[in-house]
Structure formats: C-alpha cells, structure tokens
A protein has these predicted regions:
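Membrane-embedded alpha-helical bundles of multi-pass transporters/translocases
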Residues: 2-472
C-alpha cells in the first residue's frame, strides 16, 4: 500500500538536497587536504597528526550518539532537528575557515610544531562538533521527509547529485586556489566557507519535520543505545559502512601524496593537447572520479530499483574493490587518471546506496518501540564510521613511519622518496581500499532487512504513522 503521508513538494526536495553540496564540500576538502597541509606544508610530523586523528575519532565516539539522542528528545515549536541546525551552522563555517588559515598566523604562521599541533587539535574538535550537530540532524530528517519508497529513492539520488558537485569542488579547487606552496589558502578557505554557508542555508530552508514523528518520546539514553546495539541488521550495516567510509577517507587523504610522489606530478604535462601544471593535474585527477560518478548515478539508481538498494550496494563493493587494485600499477598522471575515473563508476553506488538501508532500519525500529529514533541511529552510525578516521590516521602514521617517508624541508618541495615509501603510498591508495570493500561486502552478507521483508516494514510503518497523525 502507498504511503498516506502528504507528498513532499519539489521545492522542499531540491532545497533539502542542495544542502548536500556544502556537507560534501566541507567534509571532502577537510579529509582530502588537511593532513597534507599540516604534514607536508606546515611540517608537523606525521606520527603526531596520526595521534590527533586518533583523539578526533574518540571525540566522535562521544558527540555523535549524544547529538542524536539530544535531537530525538528535543521538543520545540520549531521541531526537533531544525533548532540544532540553526545553532550550529555559523560556528561550523567559522571553524572550517580556521582549519586552513590559523588565526593570527598568516599564510606561513611562524609557530612552533607544538603550537601548530595543539591548534590543529582544538580546531578539529570544534569543527567536528559543529559539523556533527548540523549534519546529523539534517541527515536524520531523510526518513522523515517522506515515507514513500519512490520519493526516498529520488531524494537520495538528488542528494548525491549535489554531493558529487560538492565533492568536485572540495577536491578540485583547493590545490588550484592555494597554489603549489599553499600560500594562497586564505582566499581558498574564504571561498569554500562561503559556498558551504550558502548550501547549508538552502538545506535548512528545505528541511521539513512531521509532527507525528515526535508524537512518542524516545527511551532514556542508555536504553536507546542498548536497543540500537541489539539490532542485528544495524550492526552488520555499521560494519559495512565503517569500511566504506574508510575507503572515502583513505583515498581522499592518500591521493595528494600518491599524485605527488607515485605519479610524479611535480611539473607541467600534456593531456589531449592541453598543458596542465601540477596543481591542475591534481585537481583533474581527483575530479575524474566524481565526473565519472555523475552519469553512473543513473545506472546505480536503476539497479537499486530493479534489485533493491541492498543488492546494488554489495555489487558496488565488489566492483570498487576490483578497480582499486589498479592503483598499484600507474606511474604517470595519464595512467592514474584512468584509475580514478574507473573507481568513480563504483563510487556513485557507494555514495548513494547506504542511506536507504538506514531508513528501513528506523522504520522497523518504530514498529518495535513506537518511537522515531533517527537521531540515535544516525548518531550511532556517525560514531562508528568516525572510527574510520582513527583507522585511516593510524594506518597513515604507521605506513609513513615504517616505509621511511621523507617530509619536504626548506627549499626542497619535492624530496626524493625511497621505493619503500612509494610502495606504502600504493598500499594506502589501492591495497587497503580493496581489502576494506571486500570486508564491507562480507558484512552486508549478514544484513537481512531487504526484499519482501523491507517492503512489509515500509507498509506497516506508513500505516502506524497515519494513525499517529490522526491522533494529533
């Protein structure tokens, strides 16, 4: 039976989806370049940045589920989610800017390594808290915006289209705007912060809350966590999504190093008769993945409609693992470009096919508890996937240390790397990516909420929500 909820207006769908551009831009630029900036440009040792990344992951273990729980239990005249989004938006944008351009430090802050390290730690934690509060509440609205399966699929696809553009901006513009020595990153940070602000405001304007979703109070915090962790399907989903998020983070963080040293992008080259400088090559290399992902969205959407999001996601894991192995072989920009474009075809499926599974999980949970607990589920999901930062940071620190990676020094922008370090960069880019996606495929094998069972859950949840709406 179709959903009895009011249809979601096109303007709300477009505005809500537009928020994905700023979400993806800020996250992608941060994950792709912030470690490169502090290690390779500002000279902080990789092992210390790895420690900060581990602390950052533990911090997420606290703020993600708490943010979700607070949101689930919030009751105001403006709703549960929107007040949190309003309060976190401006601090999010300010801390995003300060990540790139240390306050009072100028383009080349004359700070000690210890000062930069503690500044980095403080701003990362503040930025992450604000980002988590906004994005968790914005994401938690996804199942609430519509209960209709077709509209959910369309809304998810729309979000990911905007997300692709955000990812493109986040990976392509920073090296172009900042320059080879990153001395222009102040202007870069200002522009990216402005685009992020506008996009998140649009996402806020498109957000729509349904009063029946707040009709029943959520259980206390400990009980909420316990219920979530007893959900077998959710646990298998968390394992798979952790691996998928590691892939996004690991590739984003490794590609700048891989491009500079493995592909030897240190000067101009020619592509289709055009001369590209090193900065533009870096941008094109990363942009190729997302440009390939855009047309592939239609293919993955068709596969999801035909076979279900669950089966399509498992297939995306396998194709992604197969193409990731290719990263072991290129040694030139042109060959690397083929690899990122091929991986982009699978990237589209990995990006768009996880949220529909969480929506089904929250629908089934409502049937069991009577309460809508998107905040807790997305918060717990945020907690677990943030451990991808810990995994990525630790692996990067270990690989760089063990393989003998050489940091640039004064007057030496392109130090000669030993063969062991080059292999380590190939391992970070291709090997760990392939292994993580195989692990995600295995985890999804334990997820049972798909097919006829998922359709039955959606139908029963829609009927329950209709009864709640009539009782208001």
């Amino acid at each position: 039976m179709p959903s009895t909820a009011p249809a979601l207006a096109l303007r709300h769908r477009l505005l809500y989806a537009a928020g994905s551009l700023g979400v993806a831009l800020s996250y992608q630029a941060f994950s792709a370049y912030i470690q490169f900036l502090y290690i390779d440009v500002l000279g902080v040792r990789a092992v210390w940045i790895g420690v900060v990344w581990a602390v950052y992951g533990v911090w997420n273990a606290v703020n993600d589920p708490l943010s979700g729980y607070w949101s689930d239990r919030t009751r105001t005249r403006w709703g549960r989610r929107v007040p949190w989004m309003v309060g976190s938006l401006v601090p999010l944008v300010i801390t995003f800017y300060l990540l790139w351009f240390p306050f009072g430090g100028g383009a080349r802050p004359a700070w000690s390594e210890v000062s930069l390290l503690f500044y980095f730690l403080l701003i990362v934690l503040l930025f992450d808290f604000c980002w988590t509060v906004y994005v968790m509440n914005w994401t938690a609205l996804f199942p609430e915006m519509t209960s209709d399966e077709s509209q959910r699929a369309g809304l998810s696809a729309g979000r990911e289209v905007f997300s692709i553009f955000g990812l493109l901006v986040g990976v392509a513009l920073p090296p172009v705007l900042a320059g080879a020595d990153w001395s222009g990153r102040g202007g870069m940070a200002l522009l990216l912060s402005a685009v992020t602000f506008v996009s998140l405001v649009l996402g806020l304007l498109g957000s729509r809350e349904r009063p029946e979703f707040a009709a029943e109070p959520s259980p206390p915090f400990r009980q909420s966590v316990r219920l979530a962790l007893r959900n077998r399907d959710f646990l298998f989903f968390l394992g798979a999504n952790l691996m998928i998020q590691y892939v996004f983070l690991g590739l984003s963080a490794a590609i700048p190093f891989y491009a500079k040293y493995v592909l030897n992008i240190q000067g101009p080259t020619t592509l289709f008769g055009l001369t590209l400088n090193a900065d533009l090559q870096n941008s094109v290399l990363l942009a190729a993945a997302f440009l390939a992902a855009l047309p592939a969205m239609g293919l993955w959407w068709a596969l999801a409609r035909r076979f279900g999001a669950y089966r399509a996601l498992r297939f995306a894991c396998l194709t992604g693992a197969a193409t990731a192995v290719y990263f072991f072989f290129p040694s030139t920009f042109q060959a690397g470009l083929i690899g990122t474009a091929l991986f982009g075809l699978s990237l589209a499926g990995l990006l768009m096919l996880t949220n529909p599974l969480v929506a089904d999980i929250t629908d089934e949970d409502e049937l069991q508890t009577g309460a809508r607990r998107e905040g807790m589920f997305f918060g717990m999901n945020g907690l677990i996937i943030r451990f991808a930062f810990v995994i990525q940071g630790i692996l990067t620190a270990i690989v760089f240390t063990v393989t003998g990676y050489v940091n640039p020094s004064a007057g030496v922008l392109f130090p000669q790397q030993p063969d062991s370090a080059l292999f380590g960069l190939r391992l970070l880019t291709g090997g760990f990516t392939a292994l993580a996606l195989v692990a995600a495929f295995i985890f999804l094998g334990g997820y049972r909420l798909h097919g006829a069972r998922a359709q039955r859950v959606r139908t029963e949840a829609a009927a329950l929500q209709a009864r709640k709406r009539e009782a208001l």
